[in-house]
């Protein structure tokens, strides 16, 4: 990430600093210190933070603005107003966005991408809440648990759905069925008859609009959650390039 920033600054090109829920242009040293010290009661085997990658498609980026600066400001608005609030809600612990300690960094290039539009956002989200009291893991398999030692949980599918719907509402984006998380999740995990039914619905919708897009890549917002302990990626829900939202 630093390599891209240095190249852009040397060329006098617009560059974004770190941001959180309320502030912009935060120094890297503050980010490191804040995350490294927010580890109360964590075990040595626990991850200190999770890395989340939000990567809109070219079509989605065009809905966010015409210039890199416009798209970057729109991305920060999306993270602050949609993604982090939904992330907090999905723990089912009555948390709000202000309870989540995170830092974001926006970048504009991808080394292996041939797209003209490549803006994306890296989020670093602390394992502990803002008060350094509650452990929060988006990789837990518990979902809204009411009884037992573990209360709450995390519903990743619901997060993806809400993050997608929030994006569409915020940017007035007209998402086609074949672009949706539900479509790709069903195509990946459902029975053959259900997959055929969805394919038929997709084809019917395309014919109705007199548009054929089967040779184009599906639009996608990648949301990659990774435990940054030992640089391992322990959880893999779906890793298809055609999926709207993926966790690694």
Stretches with model-predicted labels:
Residues 1-248:
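N-terminal nicking endonuclease/strand-transfer module with a His-rich metal-binding environment
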């Amino acid at each position: 990430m630093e390599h891209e920033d240095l190249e852009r600054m040397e060329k006098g090109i617009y560059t974004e600093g770190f941001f959180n829920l309320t502030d912009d242009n935060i120094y890297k040293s503050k980010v490191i210190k804040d995350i490294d010290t927010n580890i109360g009661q964590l075990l040595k085997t626990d991850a200190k933070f999770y890395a989340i990658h939000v990567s809109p498609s070219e079509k989605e980026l065009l809905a966010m603005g015409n210039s890199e600066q416009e798209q970057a400001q729109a991305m920060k608005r999306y993270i602050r107003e949609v993604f982090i609030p939904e992330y907090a809600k999905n723990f089912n612990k009555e948390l709000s966005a202000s309870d989540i300690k995170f830092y974001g960094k926006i970048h504009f290039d991808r080394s292996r991408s041939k797209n003209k539009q490549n803006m994306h956002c890296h989020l670093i989200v602390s394992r502990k809440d803002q008060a350094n009291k509650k452990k929060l893991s988006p990789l837990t398999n518990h979902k809204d648990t009411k009884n037992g030692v573990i209360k709450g949980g995390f519903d990743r599918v619901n997060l993806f759905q809400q993050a997608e719907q929030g994006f569409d509402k915020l940017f007035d984006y007209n998402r086609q069925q074949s672009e949706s998380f539900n479509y790709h999740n069903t195509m990946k995990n459902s029975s053959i008859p259900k997959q055929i039914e969805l394919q038929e619905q997709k084809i019917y919708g395309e014919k109705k609009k007199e548009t054929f897009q089967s040779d184009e890549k599906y639009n996608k917002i990648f949301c990659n959650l990774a435990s940054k302990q030992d640089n391992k990626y322990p959880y893999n829900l779906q890793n298809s390039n055609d999926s709207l939202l993926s966790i690694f």
